[in-house]
A protein has these predicted regions:
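Bacterial Sec-dependent N-terminal signal peptides
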Residues: 1-23
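Function-determining sites in protein domains
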Residues: 20-228
Length: 228
């Protein structure tokens, strides 16, 4: 009997971790919880947001299980447009905040790229799908996307280790290229702009075809991991 129950639990966990729900998912307010986990999120988000706008236009943050966390944000200053990235010197889960260094890099970009990144996140965060459970696994990487809407509200959605072929997987790939560009990698802006525009069009077409799909809560398993 115990073996049967264990097998069923493992099967449910496997299905939850491999199933793909192709929308960004909501986040929880970590500040309302008192635990080691909430302390971790408070520390890591504080470090990652160093020097970045409180009202993000297009911000991407990555929290892996074991490697250093990092973020990149599209910013504007004095009429110019920049990508600013913060990369932590080590994974902050087991580290004291005072021992972690923030490596900041910046690169100037075109207004066209800046706008393409913002338009993409405006669309992606318009359709955050409520979840019954969590698709976040014990290992892997969680990706966060933030933007500010016309009302001045910061909208943030997350995705855990999406398949590369999905819409959210493509969103992650685009922003991975954005992060790489911010750190000095030779990635053509035109490539990122083109990919962003194609994905934006695909998201818009899905929205027209299935306008209310994201409003339907999806069951995502019985093993929620983490506040976020």
């Amino acid at each position: 009997m115990k073996k049967t129950i264990t097998t069923l639990l493992l099967l449910l966990l496997s299905l939850r971790m491999t199933g793909q729900i192709d929308y960004l998912e909501p986040i929880k307010d970590y500040s309302k919880y008192k635990s080691e986990l909430s302390g971790y999120y408070s520390n890591v988000l504080s470090l990652l947001s160093t020097g970045l706008s409180k009202k993000p236009y297009a911000c991407y943050a990555v929290i892996p299980s074991f490697s250093p966390e990092y973020t990149v944000s599209a910013e504007t200053k004095n009429g110019k447009y920049y990508l600013i990235s913060n990369t932590l010197s080590q994974n902050s889960w087991q580290a004291e905040k005072s021992t972690i260094k923030v490596n900041t890099k910046s690169t100037e970009i075109s207004k066209t790229l800046y706008q393409a990144l913002g338009e993409l996140l405006q669309m992606a965060t318009l359709q955050i799908q409520d979840m019954d459970g969590s698709t976040t696994g014990l290992d892997g990487t969680t990706y966060y996307f933030s933007t500010t809407n016309g009302k001045g509200e910061v909208l943030t959605g997350k995705k855990w280790s999406p398949d590369r072929a999905t819409l959210m997987g493509r969103l992650v790939q685009i922003y991975e290229s954005v992060y790489a560009l911010s750190t000095g990698k030779a990635i053509p802006e035109s490539l990122i702009i083109n990919d962003a525009r194609i994905l934006l069009k695909d998201l818009q077409e899905r929205s027209k075809a299935f306008p209310d799909e994201y409003k339907q809560p999806k069951y995502a398993g019985i093993f929620p991991a983490g506040l976020w």
